[in-house]
């Protein structure tokens, strides 16, 4: 049915429908969080190479970001083709367009920032490809939608450390403050901690997760000290480093792969600290990354288990539901 628009000040005649006012697009709350996150990690990379003494080649961040963009583009095309839908980057909304590319930008910079491969660039690019592509493969029915559950950057780094450990390791923690003097060294973690706390408190709403993670980390340090005789200042000293602050405020709090409600967020952070303590008791290296991988994987498996249990209950209810009784004079259709 065609819609007739009446002139200004004239009511529509009978049988005509006034044109509906355009409904403004609802702002996605993820956009502002991802935008600020991408901006902060980009600025930190610039400072890292110019002021802090990062040892990776200057061109590698550009390689990593371009690799992340290309991987996201290719796998989004494949996913859209397989699911018979429009690719996410084909949109007229500039915010939605940016929202598609921002996670890849963050992942590329994070993988390059946290991995060190000497003069071999391909292990870092391998980590970026694994990190971006797994979002289209490792998915679970979370809150009624299929979503990825593994932290992208952390998963790519962990897989690379496991498979290419001969050529690559984590970035040495000293590089984050290598060129800084004593006072500047104290300011760096404070600035990162303040910026990350504001970002997570105001935008991602992950304060409960950080509290659970930080509190649990301190508790596991005391437990390891009492049971295994670990030096307490060594176990707690990890929390004062720039690498730990970066991991806590920018890696653990990924909005897409962490819970949204208060108690699950707190339990996620506490579980991460508990798994970290267990891995440390077994002298496993790269503990932070592997612990986060284990917790994210358990969360994804939990969502799949809940999905199958719900499906099983639905099938049982359908089988045991009573059939409608026949009404006299009316045929029962089956």
Predicted feature residues:
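C-terminal ends of transmembrane helices
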Residues: 22, 71-92, 131-146, 193-205, ...
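N-terminal signal-anchor module of multipass membrane proteins
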Residues: 2-84, 88-89
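C-terminal transmembrane helix-loop-helix hairpin of multi-pass membrane proteins
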Residues: 20-42, 220-329, 334
